[in-house]
């Protein structure tokens, strides 16, 4: 069984505080007594302000900065534009923007600044300071040189209004990012300006990469006939030449360091040979081929007979040498000193008996056949 209870004062106050205007009018009409109406009205006026229990709507995201607006704010400072009001320069700057080759860079820079502004506020992120840091880094033309670099000519018409024109032969060049060879993103720009102390309170979002990036090449064409651009190009070439020379010097030193060990080792070997030369009477064989021809061991009658003769003579005792036919003892005084002899341990024999001199006599047959020493096959 449900019991009916009277509401507490806090519950009544909460009920009244959460009523709409129309509902409050209905409540006033339900109170018929004037004294009760007066008391209700007094309590209503003394009640605290109504607090909406619903979460407050989040602040609407600020609109990203327009790239053309920032381009106009930067290049309105062209010295030749100072004598005219902004309403006469808007069309001129619009023409410059249409022909500018760096629109993508301006869009990227303005997006980076908008990201900083949305987090820390415009007061903590001065726009002029932002562009004064990033524009020279990306090598965007200075306002004082913009018209000259891109071939624009400023003239004044008959009514005194400024006009700009461009020669048909003028060729605009993409001036910018000449010293960057990577994909440029919003995070890259923010990191660069923060390195100079700009927007120090800004905290980059972690693990989030911007989908906006720009790839730039280092070999961008420059104005050939413009002195300012030519000077910039010359300075870049000088820097590259210095870098190349430095790399060559480093490579040369490294090569000398690596080859120095081999040179020192060769010198040590040479010094060792000079200090301890080989003996003069030591036989040093010349290099020879290990692929010598194989001897031909076919029978040869001449050498077989010579071998048998020597073997037979050596087997006879030397004491009987004098009794052999056509032999003499070495001590025999009858040996002629003008004749060659073959000796072997008190054994002597007449060499003419072994050598045929017929081929060497005067008037001998020049076609005589000599013995063939063909025990080794000649290649």
Curated annotation (Swiss-Prot):
Keyword Transcription: yes
UniProt keyword terms in alphabetical order: DNA-binding, Fertilization, Nucleus, Transcription, Transcription regulation
DNA-binding region: 60-117
Keyword Transcription regulation among UniProt keywords: yes
GO cellular component terms listed in the entry, alphabetical order: nucleus
GO MF: DNA binding, bending
Location in the cell: Nucleus
Chief location category: nucleus
Any one Gene Ontology BP term: single fertilization
Family as reported in the entry's similarity comment: Belongs to the MATALPHA1 family.
Function comment: Mating type proteins are sequence specific DNA-binding proteins that act as master switches in fungal differentiation by controlling gene expression in a cell type-specific fashion. Transcriptional activator that induces the transcription of alpha-specific genes.
Name listed for the protein in its UniProt record: Mating-type protein MAT-1
């Amino acid at each position: 069984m449900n019991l009916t209870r009277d509401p507490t004062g806090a519950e009544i106050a909460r009920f009244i505080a959460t009523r709409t205007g129309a509902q409050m009018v209905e409540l006033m009409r339900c109170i018929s007594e004037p004294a009760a109406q007066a008391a209700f009205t007094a309590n209503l006026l003394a009640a605290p302000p109504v607090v909406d229990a619903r979460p407050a709507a989040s602040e609407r995201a600020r609109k990203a900065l327009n790239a053309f607006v920032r381009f106009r704010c930067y290049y309105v400072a062209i010295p030749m534009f100072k004598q005219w009001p902004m309403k006469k320069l808007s069309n001129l700057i619009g023409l410059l923007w249409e022909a500018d080759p760096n629109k993508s860079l301006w869009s990227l820079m303005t997006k980076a600044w908008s990201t900083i502004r949305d987090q820390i506020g415009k007061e903590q992120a001065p726009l002029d300071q932002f562009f004064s840091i990033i524009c020279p880094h990306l090598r965007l033309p200075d306002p004082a040189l913009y018209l000259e670099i891109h071939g624009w000519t400023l003239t004044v018409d008959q009514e005194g209004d400024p006009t700009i024109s461009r020669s048909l032969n003028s060729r605009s060049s993409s001036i910018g990012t000449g010293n960057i060879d990577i994909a440029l993103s919003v995070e890259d720009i923010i990191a660069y300006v923060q390195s100079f102390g700009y927007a120090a309170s800004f905290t980059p979002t972690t693990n989030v990469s911007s989908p906006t990036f720009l790839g730039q090449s280092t070999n961008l064409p420059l104005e050939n006939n413009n002195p300012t651009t030519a000077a910039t190009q010359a300075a870049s070439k000088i820097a590259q030449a210095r870098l190349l020379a430095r790399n060559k010097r480093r490579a040369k030193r490294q090569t000398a360091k690596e080859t120095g060990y081999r040179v020192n080792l060769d010198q040590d070997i040479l010094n060792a040979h000079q200090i301890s030369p080989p003996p003069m009477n030591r036989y040093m064989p010349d290099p020879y081929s290990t692929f010598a021809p194989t001897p031909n061991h076919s029978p040869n009658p001449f050498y077989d007979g010579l071998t048998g003769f020597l073997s037979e003579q050596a087997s006879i005792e030397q004491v009987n040498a004098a009794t052999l036919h056509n032999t003499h003892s070495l001590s025999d005084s009858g040996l002629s000193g003008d004749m060659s002899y073959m000796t072997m341990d008190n054994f002597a024999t007449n060499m003419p008996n072994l050598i045929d001199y017929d081929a060497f006599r005067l008037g001998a047959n020049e076609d005589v056949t000599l013995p063939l020493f063909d025990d080794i096959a000649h290649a």
